[in-house]
Structure formats: structure tokens, C-alpha cells
Amino acid sequence: KEGYPMGRNGCKISCVINNNFCKVECQAKWRQSDGYCYFWGLSCYCTNLPDDAQVWDSSTNKCGG
């Protein structure tokens, strides 16, 4: 599984071309994952996630920002 990790506010985690920051964010939530900064979305994107990982979904978006 893969997807955008969410911050405490339910929003995607913003980044500006900083893959290491995103890798740390992803691994803080899911140890075996990897992550990078998705340039077009300016948001962190995680890969190699467990099937039950909760990631941002446009259909259930509760982001207030």
C-alpha cells in the first residue's frame, strides 16, 4: 500500500523537494516504510505501507486547511 500520510489536523504533510524529511515522517508512523516528497503535490508520499495504514483520501478528506 502507499499514500499520503496525514498530520494531526488530517491534512497531507507539506514538503518542498525534501525527500529525507518525508522519509523520516513516513518511518515515524510506519517503521518499514519509505517516503519522498511528491513534487507536483508538494506533499510527502509514503510507500511500502501496511494494509491497515490510514492515509489521506480525497473522498474522506477532513483537512481544515
Curated annotation (Swiss-Prot):
Beta toxins bind voltage-independently at site-4 of sodium channels (Nav) and shift the voltage of activation toward more negative potentials thereby affecting sodium channel activation and promoting spontaneous and repetitive firing. Keywords: Disulfide bond, Ion channel impairing toxin, Neurotoxin, Secreted, Toxin, Voltage-gated sodium channel impairing toxin. Belongs to the long (4 C-C) scorpion toxin superfamily. Sodium channel inhibitor family. Beta subfamily. It comes from the Eukaryota. GO terms for cellular component: extracellular region. Has the structural arrangement of an alpha-helix connected to antiparallel beta-sheets by disulfide bonds (CS-alpha/beta). CDD domains: neurotoxins_LC_scorpion (cd23106). The keyword Secreted applies. This is Putative beta-neurotoxin RjAa1. PROSITE patterns: LCN_CSAB (PS51863). InterPro entries: LCN-type_CS_alpha_beta_dom, Scorpion_toxin-like, Scorpion_toxin-like_sf, Scorpion_toxinL, Scorpion_toxinL/defensin. GO terms for molecular function: sodium channel inhibitor activity; toxin activity. It is found in: Secreted. Residues 1-64 form the LCN-type CS-alpha/beta domain. One of its GO terms (biological process) is defense response. Expressed by the venom gland. It holds the Pfam family Toxin_3. The keyword Secreted applies. Disulfide bonds join 11-63, 15-37, 22-44, 26-46. Its main location: secreted.
